[in-house]
Regions:
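Serine-hydrolase catalytic-loop signature spanning alpha/beta hydrolases and amidase-signature enzymes
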Residues: 72-80, 91
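Structural cue for short, hydrophobic secondary-structure segments
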Residues: 67-70, 93
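Catalytic histidine-centered segment of alpha/beta-hydrolase-like enzymes
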Residues: 298-307, 311
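Flexible "cap/lid" subdomain of the alpha/beta-hydrolase fold that forms the substrate-access gate
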Residues: 28-39, 47-49, 54-59, 64, ...
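Boundary at the C-terminal end of the N-terminal hydrophobic targeting segment
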Residues: 20, 24-27
Length: 324
């Protein structure tokens, strides 16, 4: 649990402000919503995990990329990356448990980090693969860091978006006053229920408030529909189960194993929940190369705010590290 909390400490919910969202990539690419194929994998305890995929037909020779969303989100967060990269890679975006078309088990314990990692492993095995490139944003980033650390044999490469290495973030969470203040929303999520009318930054949790950050009107409509199928209490259970204490009196994190595969990190510098200071020293916790891309003007949802930069960089980086 302490190891997972070290990873989960670096997770963030929604950015309070999004500036200059770039939807040009979405405009250039055919929308994937009606083009993807859907499937379900069975995880521990019989929990069904939904995934959407696009790309070459499944085969051992096609590089597999698993995409893991954060809060509040669903598989469609990766629409631009799926559309642009599916010519070369099998792009598989999951709905994390509690969201959209995946199962929504009851109880805080059902959202323990170990189970979230098991969900990703279940999808890879269901697809008949031994390993994949793991991509994660926000809570998906926490799961991705954890997956890479403890299932390195299943991790080809690691791509993280707006989520520092847990050791870097915990350092800031214990000593950086700005970061501590920026993380106060997580305490609200831990102490209130989804039915509280002020739980979501002073507003109720509704499909409309949860999707208010989405700029594209058609995408927002699909987010509202996905959140109508989601469990709001389950969303908060991620925080209740896994988010650790902050401040100088917080217990130090347990040691974490070094990440053994190449890592690509994107960070939108306008993220109002996450200080970029947490990125410092990332290289100390990795065994292989780190590529760090900071994006001025992009916020927490960097894969959408700067989708063209993210997608172009992913293609270059993955092509250099994968073979057909």
């Amino acid at each position: 649990m302490r190891m997972w909390k070290a990873v989960a400490a670096a997770v963030f919910g929604v950015a309070l402000a999004l500036e200059g969202a770039d939807i040009s990539m979405a405009a250039q690419q055919p929308d994937v919503y009606g083009r993807v194929e859907h499937g379900y994998a069975t995880s521990e305890g019989g929990v069904k995990i939904h995934y959407a995929w696009l790309g070459p037909k499944q085969s051992a020779g096609t590089p597999l990329v698993i995409l893991i969303h954060g809060f509040p989100d669903f598989w469609y967060s990766w629409r631009d990356q799926m559309a642009a990269l599916s010519d070369r890679f099998q792009m598989v975006a999951i709905d994390q448990r509690g969201y959209n078309l995946s199962d929504k088990p009851k109880g805080v314990e059902s959202y323990d980090g170990r189970l979230l990692v098991a969900d990703v492993a279940a999808v890879i095995k269901h697809l008949g693969r031994a390993k994949a490139t793991i991509v994660g944003h926000d809570w998906g980033g926490a799961v991705a860091w954890q997956f890479a650390m403890f299932l390195p044999q299943m991790t080809e490469n690691l791509i993280i978006l707006n989520l520092p290495h847990p050791s870097g973030f915990l350092r800031e969470l214990r000593s950086n006053k700005d970061q501590i203040a920026n993380s106060e929303y997580a305490r609200t999520f831990q102490t209130k229920s989804a039915s509280d009318p002020t739980v979501f930054f002073g507003k109720p949790m509704t499909p409309e408030t949860l999707s208010s950050w989405v700029r594209d009107p058609m995408a927002r409509k699909r987010y509202i529909e996905a959140f109508q199928r989601s469990d709001f209490e389950a969303m908060l259970n991620y925080y209740k189960r896994n988010y650790p204490a902050s401040g100088p009196d917080a217990p130090p994190p347990a040691p974490l194993p070094k990440v053994k595969m190449p890592v690509l990190v994107f960070h939108g510098l306008a993220d109002t929940a996450l200080n970029a200071d947490g990125l410092s020293g990332t290289w100390n916790w990795l065994e292989k190369d780190l590529t760090l891309v900071t994006v001025p003007g992009a916020g927490h949802f960097v894969q959408q705010d700067a989708s063209e930069m993210v997608t172009t960089t992913m293609r270059w980086w993955l092509t250099a590290r994968t073979t057909k």
